């Protein structure tokens, strides 16, 4: 599952719409309808428009989460039906990618931990929101499979593997900190059957994140190598805070981790960046992408600053525009949900 093949970097930047003339609830409904019209095929398959219209377990997880959050039960049921039939493996986890243009749409059966977590979380939230027990059992099965297949005891820490295959490097492991969906993991730790292991996964993941501080801006990389005498950017990936790691502060904000957000806000507020994250920062030499980041990045920056300040006043609200592709639009919707739910989340 090469990281570079998961998404295409956006090469055209756009501004954050922010607060608009719409009321927050009306804008939320408009955003969801826009997202669904552009990125949800037949109300079932969520497409990555920046990557040949493939679907990921991640895109399906986000689609489920959005449908649940915006009270669209019919679309939720359709997305889940397609996801379970097209991507779910025998062990309960999900193949990470579905391609519409190949003879076998799922040639790589490996999973992606963030997709698994997002799907399990969306199902649990839907079961509670709509009082639908039919979605709780599959959520619990996925949660158990995540702990069984992806949670590894290593050097006194319980770490989350990005996928079941391909991330061991001898006596070291490659970790992707953006795959830790903190509000979901915390919810599992509060409600799941194996609360102790979820709590360990949360606490040890936050320890990894706190120590993953590289370069002049002390930021986490997209991919981290962890092991004996090894705590560094993973060798097989570029030393970037970029397309993956931008989700780290987003999920921290959603989890109400104000004390952990300061380094991101400080980095983005340097005169060089003017408050907006670059598309990527090279953590080795400080160079940045020669093209601007998307409006989704700006939405993440806005909610990060909002939650770093304690979630006071009105949360920023980003509007999906015609310039947003799937990933940028998703970051906007996720940031809006983080701003809505983050101030009420329990701190760890």
Task: Please annotate each region the language model reported.
Residues 64-69, 118-128, 183-187, 250-254, ...:
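Short glycine/serine- and small hydrophobic-enriched flexible loop segments
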Residues 30, 53-58, 114, 136-312, ...:
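Extended ligand-binding clefts on enzyme/binding-domain cores
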Residues 70, 83-86, 90, 126, ...:
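Alpha-helical solenoid scaffolds that mediate protein-protein interactions
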Residues 93-142:
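Substrate-binding cleft of extracellular glycoside hydrolase catalytic domains
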Residues 347-348:
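Short, solvent-exposed mixed-charge patches
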Residues 1-2, 8-28:
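N-terminal export signals
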């Amino acid at each position: 599952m090469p990281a570079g093949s998961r998404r295409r970097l956006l090469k055209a930047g756009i501004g954050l719409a922010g607060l608009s003339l719409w009321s927050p609830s009306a804008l939320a409904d408009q955003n969801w309808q826009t997202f669904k019209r552009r990125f949800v095929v037949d109300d079932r398959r969520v497409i990555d428009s920046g990557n040949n219209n493939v679907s990921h377990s991640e895109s399906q997880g986000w689609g489920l989460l959005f449908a649940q959050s915006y009270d669209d039960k019919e679309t939720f049921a359709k997305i889940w039906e397609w996801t379970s039939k097209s991507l779910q493996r025998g062990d309960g986890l999900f193949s990470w990618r579905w391609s519409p243009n190949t003879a076998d749409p799922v040639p790589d059966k490996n999973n992606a931990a963030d997709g698994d977590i997002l799907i399990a979380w969306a199902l649990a939230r839907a079961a509670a929101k709509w009082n639908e027990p039919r979605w709780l059992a599959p959520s619990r099965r996925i949660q158990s499979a995540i702990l069984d297949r992806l949670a590894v005891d290593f050097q006194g820490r319980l770490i989350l593997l990005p996928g079941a295959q391909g991330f061991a490097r001898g006596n070291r492991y490659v970790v992707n900190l953006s795959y830790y969906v903190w509000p979901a993991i915390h919810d599992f730790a509060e409600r799941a059957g194996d609360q102790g292991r979820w709590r360990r996964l949360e606490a040890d993941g936050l320890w990894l994140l706190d120590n993953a501080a590289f370069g002049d801006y002390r930021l986490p990389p997209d991919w981290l190598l962890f092991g004996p005498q090894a705590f560094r950017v993973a060798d097989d990936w570029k030393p970037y805070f970029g397309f993956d790691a931008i989700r780290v502060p987003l999920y921290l904000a959603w989890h109400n981790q104000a004390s952990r957000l300061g380094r991101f806000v400080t980095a983005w507020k340097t005169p060089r960046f003017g408050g907006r994250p670059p598309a990527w920062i090279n953590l080795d030499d400080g160079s940045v992408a020669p093209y601007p980041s998307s409006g989704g990045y700006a939405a993440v920056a806005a909610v990060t600053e909002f939650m770093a300040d304690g979630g006071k006043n009105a949360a920023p609200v980003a509007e999906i525009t015609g310039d947003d592709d799937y990933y940028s639009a998703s970051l906007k919707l996720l940031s809006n949900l983080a701003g809505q739910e983050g101030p009420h989340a329990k701190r760890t």
